């Protein structure tokens, strides 16, 4: 089993970290750069910044925030939200991000994935997918515009297409689970993980360390995105990793030298 990644996710609105339930009822948590620095000290593997209103309101992400974070962090930074064009993609990377996450624009123009992969390399291209179960619960549907609009696309078919077009990673968020703290959507994750060969990052629903253990033991997810658990101080990244290792799940831990 490859080393599993723990990735704190910072949903950003108007330059502040926020958190809600099922994509609504947002509460302000704090400054994204300061939180990211804390998580890096706790041995986070990567950081994700998602501007959760940029796509819907068609706003551009402020490069200054990305630049601040890039200067302060030594771990990879993924940034998403409002990425509409190759120029947007280029600007985010130039600001200091290591990867760029695209969502709505990829569905509206799938060739965007191919163009980005060709110009910047597949390692920079993350396709974020927001999905929820259909009415019968038999399959999953993709949503865009920050989860506000049904794209009318089957999740598994879209994930396969993303891989074919050049996505280096899929960031899969369960809208049904988002913010509920009832555990990841294992059924959804298994459906996608079994259909693609690129890394899948699990997102939406983490409420405890046991939920993270479950997602790695019961799915082939490569990484777990975590928000509320860390933002509200219910656990630290290093505490999560210690429990993973106790459960024979490989995780990266850097031992701090005592001076």
UniProtKB/Swiss-Prot annotation:
Its EC number is 4.3.2.10. Its main location: cytoplasm. It comes from the Bacteria. It is found in: Cytoplasm. InterPro entries: Aldolase_TIM (IPR013785), His_biosynth (IPR006062), HisF (IPR004651), IGPS_HisA/HisF (IPR050064), RibuloseP-bd_barrel (IPR011060). The keyword Nucleotide-binding does not apply. SUPFAM superfamilies: Ribulose-phoshate binding barrel (SSF51366). GO terms for biological process: L-histidine biosynthetic process. It catalyses: 5-[(5-phospho-1-deoxy-D-ribulos-1-ylimino)methylamino]-1-(5-phospho-beta-D-ribosyl)imidazole-4-carboxamide + L-glutamine = D-erythro-1-(imidazol-4-yl)glycerol 3-phosphate + 5-amino-1-(5-phospho-beta-D-ribosyl)imidazole-4-carboxamide + L-glutamate + H(+). CDD domains: HisF. GO terms for cellular component: cytoplasm. Keywords: Amino-acid biosynthesis, Cytoplasm, Histidine biosynthesis, Lyase. The keyword Protein biosynthesis does not apply. Pathway: Amino-acid biosynthesis; L-histidine biosynthesis; L-histidine from 5-phospho-alpha-D-ribose 1-diphosphate: step 5/9. The active site is at 11, 130. GO terms for molecular function: imidazoleglycerol-phosphate synthase activity; lyase activity. Heterodimer of HisH and HisF. IGPS catalyzes the conversion of PRFAR and glutamine to IGP, AICAR and glutamate. The HisF subunit catalyzes the cyclization activity that produces IGP and AICAR from PRFAR using the ammonia provided by the HisH subunit. Belongs to the HisA/HisF family. This is Imidazole glycerol phosphate synthase subunit HisF. It comes from Lactococcus lactis subsp. cremoris (strain MG1363). The lineage of its organism: Bacteria, Bacillati, Bacillota, Bacilli, Lactobacillales. The gene is hisF.
